[in-house]
Every structure is written in structure tokens, then in C-alpha cells.
Amino acid sequence: MATTRLIPLHTGKGRKFGKAIRNVIGYVSNPKKTHQGELVTGFGCNPETADGEFLLMKREYIARTGRRRGKDDVIAYHLRQSFVPGEITPEEANRIGCELAKRFTHGQHAYVVATHEDRRHVHSHIIFSAVNLDCDRKFRDFFRERTSTGQTERYTVRGKRAVDH
């Protein structure tokens, strides 16, 4: 089973939206960690320009809805998925990461999946835009709501075991 963690990303600490997204996508897409970029996949965006595309979606969302949040605004989400060492190839992990992202967002949000092979355990980072592809809605984090009420379930991913942290 794989462990998966969802982390909301905020601008915070004086950073602008574009810089915050550029920093996180730059980190997860690092060629040294992703087999020279071969383990980076995008949906609804080009991984090389995803930061700019996420920014355009955010601006379009504000223009369409008139909704603007402050510093606490969630600009994107970061899913981390880790596997037990030796149990999965980086290519399989990337494919499973893409499947998870598609299921998690219902194919409605642009995302970048970057699989790292620089540690003992293979792990994927999934960054997806908080704004949907139609730029008229934002992702609602029902998973975190269920977690806080103790209603989460353990999901297995193709029989893979969890990494102990």
C-alpha cells in the first residue's frame, strides 16, 4: 500500500502566487530527481509552463466569479505518494500517480506528476491547481474534512505496502 498525503499550498510569507507555484513545481520537476525530466507528466497543462498556466486559471477564475481570497487562499494542492523500497519501479509509480491525480480531481483540474527516485523509496509529487479547467470552481478538500472527523478509510494502491515514517 502507498502512503498518500494531501497538503494545501498557500502564498503566505510575502510570496506572490506565481513565485509560490514556480518554487514548488521547480522543486518537484528537478531533473536530478526525475531521471532528467522523464518522470514528469502533465494533464491540462505543460509541466514546463504549469506555473504560468495555473496563474492564468486563477486570474480567469477571479474574473468570472469575482471571488478573491486573502493570504489564506489555497492556490494549489500537493499530494505526496510514497512506496516501500524495491516494490515498484519509478515508471509504475508515475503511472499510478497520474491515475490517482485523475481520480482525485475527477479529471477537472490541471496537474503535474513528478516521480522522484533520489531516495531509497520511490515517491511521486502531484501538484494540481485549486481552480478547475473551466475556471469557474475551486477544489473542495472533502478528504481533509473526513480526516478531521475520523471517517477516513485506508486505501490500497495495487497491493503496494505503506512506507513507515
Where are these regions (language model features)?
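N-terminal nicking endonuclease/strand-transfer module with a His-rich metal-binding environment
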Residues: M1-H165
